[in-house]
A protein has these predicted regions:
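A short helix/loop element that forms part of the nucleotide-sugar donor recognition site in Leloir-type
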Residues: 213-220
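Histidine-centered beta-alpha loop that forms part of the nucleotide-sugar donor binding/catalytic region
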Residues: 13, 66, 127-128, 150-154, ...
Length: 220
């Protein structure tokens, strides 16, 4: 067995849709699978392995579904979420409390079982939300390296109108420090995450996923 071979897991949501993130994930996962054991753990149940040439690749797939039952856990998490967002100060202690409700305990158990069952060397969270899932269970994962791969800009997450993570800067900062690494797509974003949230990030630019053909019209 090749001693340099690694078992790598990408934890992602929509894998088989039409989008930039899906395309980039496919390019990188397929390239890595030439020399490593690569699996994508997806919440996407609309499986279509013909997308992006997955069916002809060595990339493996696992799936996970979170059942959102309106049980006692659901309402307890709702209460904690309300308190954190509307009443409590935002600090390290309250961020830890909010982590309980952001990703429900029953969901955490599911994800821990999936990840630890695969005996992976590295796990990569695709997108901020799924990276936060991994951060909340980092101490319980038997994995050497857990990394966040953030595809949204700092402004899109926190500053623009209708940001993806409104009012969650403190929570994001505290949770992400649990991870072994954070990857962003630009040096400017790396600076913003460092200066505003105290998070050290590495910059890895997305690969070219479309091959340009011909010359662009001067009209554009």
């Amino acid at each position: 067995m090749n001693s340099s071979l690694m078992k790598i897991l990408f934890y992602a949501d929509t894998v088989f849709g039409f989008g930039g993130v899906q395309r980039v994930l496919a390019v990188i996962a397929k390239a890595l699978s030439d020399e490593h054991d690569v699996t994508i753990l997806s919440t996407d149940t609309d499986v279509n392995l013909s997308m992006y040439g997955y069916g002809q690749s060595k990339v493996k797939f696992e799936y996970i579904t979170y059942q959102g039952n309106r049980d006692l856990e659901f309402y307890f998490c709702k209460c904690i979420s309300f308190l954190y967002k509307m009443v409590l100060p935002h600090n390290r202690a309250t961020s830890k409390l909010y982590s309980y409700s952001f990703f429900r305990p029953s969901y955490k158990k599911q994800l821990i079982a999936k990840v630890n069952g695969g005996e992976y060397d590295a796990v990569i969270g695709v997108h901020a939300f799924l990276s936060l899932h991994l951060a909340s269970i980092r101490k319980r994962l038997n994995v050497k390296n857990v990394t966040a791969w953030i595809h949204n800009s700092y402004d899109a997450l926190f500053e623009k109108n209708n940001p993806y993570l409104p009012g969650l800067k403190s929570f994001f900062s505290n949770e992400m420090k649990r991870l072994d690494g954070i990857v962003v797509l630009s040096k400017s974003d790396a600076s913003l995450f460092r200066d505003n949230l105290g998070l050290e990030c590495m910059t890895i630019y997305n690969p070219l996923t479309l091959e340009p053909r011909g010359k662009a019209s001067s009209e554009y």
